[in-house]
Amino acid sequence: MSFKVNWKSLETDSLTSWTKDLLTSALNSGKSPNILASSISIKDLNFGKIAPNFEILEIGELGRDRFRGIFKINYEGDFHLTLHTNVQANPLNIYYSNSMEKEIDSQFVTPNFLLSNEQFALPLDLKLSDIKISGIGIIVFSKSKGLTLVFRNDPLDSIKVSSTFDTVQVLANFLQKQIETQIRDLFRETLPTLIHQFSLKYLSLDNNSDDLHAHFASSSRTHSSALDPDNEFNNFTYSSKNLQKNLQLFNTRETLDLHIPKFKGIIQRSHLEKFTQNYPSLLNSLYLNLHEIDMKSYNTYNNNTGSNGIPIDLLINDKNFNRTNRVLKEISDIQSNSFYKQSNNNKDTTVKPKRRRIKYSTRKKAASPTSTLINDDFHMASLHSSVASSMPMSMSSSLSDSEERPQLLAQPRPMRISPDFYQAFLKSTPEQCWYQCKRVGLGTNYFNFATSQPISTSPIKKDPARDFIKEKKSINYIDINKVNNKLKELSMDRSGKRKQRNYGSATYESENPIVAPPPPYSH
């Protein structure tokens, strides 16, 4: 199936202006490169007189609100388009702009070089003509999803690019390659995206109009049903008690009575200024001390921020340095007054608040006589308890009966144990039954392989250990006594040396005959 396109119908001013606006917005969308000194404008647009050949190869789906088909398009006409812009001819400015974007932040302070920052723009007219297109595409249309256009191949065969820089062959070749690459990207990505967005735009208008008509119709029906006295749903929507309470609360605010009923836990907006006026804060102190802060900025900052912090906005927005300096000085005075205390006699003199200090002194105070008496009594009592524990029960009971110890309210001290306390305890305690009783099982003494004898330990020295000071000796020191003792031992070994024993035979020469070792150990 093929179609004949009436190409002359496109030669209208309305379509030409609409196409120019569409192309201008599409070319200037996004961030422009630094090499361009101005925006791109459409200088000339002409559709030509030769129409393209459009042929439908296949229709996959056809319906009232959807369509899917494959088509073929061929064009070799006289369409031409002229673009106008200004190009940056200063390479230092281009390099500076690129480095600011990629490497350096815009807030970074850089030297202002006149040569690198000066713009040198050159006008550029770019003409596109002799376009040859041959491609196969797929069209999918849906009323809900819009129109989608996709090309199976690269539709651009050739294009002629002419500009004001054609005399420079290097620039002409560069522009030719760049324009061809951009047009191929246009057919592959940009054109399908634009067609899809515009189709959604027009389809959404139709859908919105239908939705508005349906909404108005439903609202008119609900309004008429709400006015119907026979509708039982209205009885459950609003309660008469709630309406009476709301009406009573509304009427209380429309009276001139001084005794207005209050709500619990609520601050009314009419009384909010009185509540925040006496609230201690840094901003209130600044407003009272400095009359330079206007009421408008005070109310704006006080309503926006409820914190008790430093009003940074008042300092940043103010361009007067002297005024900002006075505000900062007043803030420091307020903070210092809150830290230091004023003396009662003179208000100008301030007193630094006392801080809690802990002293770690090395000197020990002399103990009072009462404390020494208490400690001595407690020491005697501890000795008495240790003696009583080591003595028999009868003697301890007699001593306790004869002497009555008074109650001492003093810090307890650890009891000193005699050196032989552990040995005496082991001797006094009888052996347990399981050491002597025999039971059936592995071994004896009911699996208790430990001996019943007490553990022998070295006696604890009664006298404190004395520190013997050893004299330091040099590395070359020779102990004569050790040398003499070693020589005596060697002489005794030589004199008492016996004949060499023969372990291979049964008998060997020795004063004390020894039996030869068994055969495996014979030499």
UniProtKB/Swiss-Prot annotation:
Membrane topology classification: Multi-pass membrane protein
CDD domains xref list: SMP_Mdm34
Renumbered residue ranges of the record's region Disordered: 489-523
Primary residence: mitochondrion
Record InterPro entries: Mdm34, SMP_LBD
Keyword annotations of the record: Lipid transport, Lipid-binding, Membrane, Mitochondrion, Mitochondrion outer membrane, Transmembrane, Transmembrane beta strand, Transport
GO biological process: mitochondrial genome maintenance; mitochondrion-endoplasmic reticulum membrane tethering; phospholipid transport
Keyword Transmembrane applies: yes
Single GO MF descriptor: lipid binding
Family that this chain belongs to: Belongs to the MDM34 family.
Domain comment as written in the entry: Lacks alpha-helical transmembrane segments, suggesting that it resides in the membrane via beta-sheet conformations similar to those predicted for other outer membrane proteins and porin.
Function summary: Component of the ERMES/MDM complex, which serves as a molecular tether to connect the endoplasmic reticulum (ER) and mitochondria. Components of this complex are involved in the control of mitochondrial shape and protein biogenesis, and function in nonvesicular lipid trafficking between the ER and mitochondria. MDM34 is required for the interaction of the ER-resident membrane protein MMM1 and the outer mitochondrial membrane-resident beta-barrel protein MDM10.
Self-association state and partner proteins as the record states: Component of the ER-mitochondria encounter structure (ERMES) or MDM complex, composed of MMM1, MDM10, MDM12 and MDM34.
Name assigned to this protein: Mitochondrial distribution and morphology protein 34
Originating organism: Scheffersomyces stipitis (strain ATCC 58785 / CBS 6054 / NBRC 10063 / NRRL Y-11545) (Yeast)
Gene that this sequence comes from: MDM34
